[in-house]
């Protein structure tokens, strides 16, 4: 009986850990689409059911750590990219491991897109899809262990 209990407890623990990772909350490396180089580290948090993300580190070789978003057109214009909130107002879709309804900012060109986050590969990676009208682009971010 003790073996059955331990086996059931192990299965529940592993299942809970796997489910806990199917969330965008955590620390992620963004990857350059063209060079496959790690660009930055983004920390995604959740508060009151709303997900947001900030630039925690600029990791690209030669990145100016004091760079500001001069091309931004909202409240982030002229502000430091390091520490900047680039993901705003995403909410979980009922019954799915998908977060949407918010925006993502590309601080390199100041463009803002409708955002959709989907954890994949057991939560080890995150598909970040940015859309504007009929144009969309998906990046795959990698969870930092």
Identify the meaning behind each predicted range.
Residues 13-17:
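N-terminal signal peptide c-region/cleavage motif recognized by signal peptidases
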Residues 31-115:
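Central antiparallel beta-sheet cores of small beta-barrel/beta-sandwich binding domains
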Residues 54, 127-129:
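Beta-strand residues in well-ordered beta-sheet regions across diverse protein folds
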Residues 123, 131-145:
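Edge beta-strand at a domain terminus
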Residues 47, 120-122:
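Structural motif
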Residues 18-27:
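N-terminal helix-cap/turn-to-beta initiation motif at the start of protein domains
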Residues 7-8, 18:
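Cleavable N-terminal signal peptides
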Residues 1-7:
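Bacterial N-terminal signal peptides that target proteins for export
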């Amino acid at each position: 009986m003790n073996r059955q209990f331990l086996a059931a407890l192990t299965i529940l623990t592993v299942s809970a850990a796997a489910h806990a990772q199917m969330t965008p909350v955590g620390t992620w490396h963004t990857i350059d689409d063209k060079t496959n180089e790690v660009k930055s580290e983004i920390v995604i948090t959740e508060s009151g059911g709303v997900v947001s993300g900030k630039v925690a580190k600029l990791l690209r070789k030669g990145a100016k750590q004091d760079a500001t978003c001069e091309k931004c057109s909202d409240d982030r214009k002229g502000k430091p990219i390091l520490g900047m909130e680039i993901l705003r107002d995403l909410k979980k879709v009922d019954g799915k491991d998908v977060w949407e309804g918010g925006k993502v900012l590309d601080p390199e060109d100041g463009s803002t897109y409708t955002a959709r986050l989907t954890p994949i590969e057991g939560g080890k990676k995150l598909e970040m899809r940015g859309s504007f009208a009929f144009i969309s682009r998906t990046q795959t971010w990698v969870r930092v262990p």
